[in-house]
A protein has these predicted regions:
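Alpha-helical transmembrane segments of multi-pass small-molecule/ion transporters
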Residues: 1-314
Length: 314
């Protein structure tokens, strides 16, 4: 077994377990997350060409789907005759409305999907959330700042993390082709960085949940379940759309299912009941577990296919 395969098999879940068990010391390193993420994205973006980054019809479909799920889910839950219905509705709203994670292109690359389509969507989705997010939350929630302040926060929180490594990778591709070729040859770099980053993200999420001590146990359990159910719904819809449009289940599945929890939690804290952010924290844990399972399954399938091809040649 190669080191890369060993890390895919055991390193990912080991990283998740480490983040849960050692969340206190690791959460101190949370300021490193944006910089580690940008480094990981740089290696991923070195594998695509500038001409591949462009809007596509599927991007508009994804944005509309996201908004419909968010508003439909909110109003469906808001008027249920149960205690804390408004808090649950806010949690559902944000689990659907949350922008796509900047790390989505990395996972798509590890799973053999289209990095270009997801990278384009990360940028377009960020721009759409800058406009629609504050408007929707200002309508349904209780804003603590101006519309311009909210739009600026989302812009500063997401766009540089994607654009800096993207432009750096394209610049090196153009000016330093030999360096670019060397960077492209480091195909395992994104995996190694993701294993480290995953432990920090999980630790930061668990630390956040541990601090949220308000609310009864039943409410917390329901909020966690909301994170799980909305995660399943979005990955399922995304994968079904991806099979129909692209003939594979990875690309659109990650675009719709993998979320930027830090931005979502901030938006909840700014507009809605803060306890609703427990669902988004739970969503982050579930999506990372699912991503790890996908990478392991993809790696095992590749190994099996290689063995079959080897037998056929012999």
């Amino acid at each position: 077994m190669t080191i890369q395969r060993f890390l895919k098999e055991y390193g990912l879940f080991g990283s998740i377990l480490l983040g849960i068990v050692a969340y206190r010391p690791l959460s101190v390193l949370s300021p490193m997350i944006p910089y580690v993420l940008m480094t990981m994205l740089f290696f991923t973006f070195s594998r695509i060409a500038p001409r591949d980054i462009r809007p596509r019809p599927i991007h508009l479909t994804l944005i509309v789907t996201q908004i419909v799920l968010a508003l439909g889910g909110y109003f469906l839950v808001r008027y249920l005759p149960v205690p804390y219905a408004e808090i649950y509705a806010q949690a559902v709203l944000m689990c659907f409305l949350c922008p796509v994670a900047a790390a989505a292109p990395v996972i798509v690359g590890l799973l053999g999907g289209s990095i270009a389509i997801v990278t384009s969507y990360v940028v377009l989705n960020c721009l759409s959330i800058i406009i629609t997010g504050p408007l929707i939350l200002g309508w349904l929630g209780h804003p603590q700042g101006t519309l311009l302040e909210s739009m600026t926060h989302v812009l500063v929180g997401v766009l540089p993390i994607v654009m800096i490594p993207l432009l750096t990778a394209f610049g090196i591709r153009w000016k330093l082709p030999s360096v670019h070729a060397r960077v492209r040859s480091l195909s395992s770099a994104s995996l190694y960085i993701w294993i480290f980053l995953l432990s920090l993200v999980i630790a930061n999420t668990v630390h956040f949940v541990a601090k949220e001590r308000q609310g009864v146990a039943t409410m917390i359990i329901v909020l966690v379940l909301i994170g799980l159910v909305t995660c399943i719904i979005q990955y399922s819809i995304g994968k079904a759309m991806s099979r129909k449009v692209l003939g594979e289940s990875v690309t659109i599945g990650q675009a719709l299912g993998q979320k930027n929890s830090s931005i979502s939690i901030w938006m909840i804290q700014s507009y809605l009941n803060p306890i609703a952010s427990v669902s988004q924290a739970a969503y982050s844990i579930f999506q990372n577990i699912f991503n790890a399972l996908q990478v392991i399954h993809h790696d095992r399938r590749q190994v099996l296919e290689q063995r079959i091809r080897h037998k056929e040649r012999n």
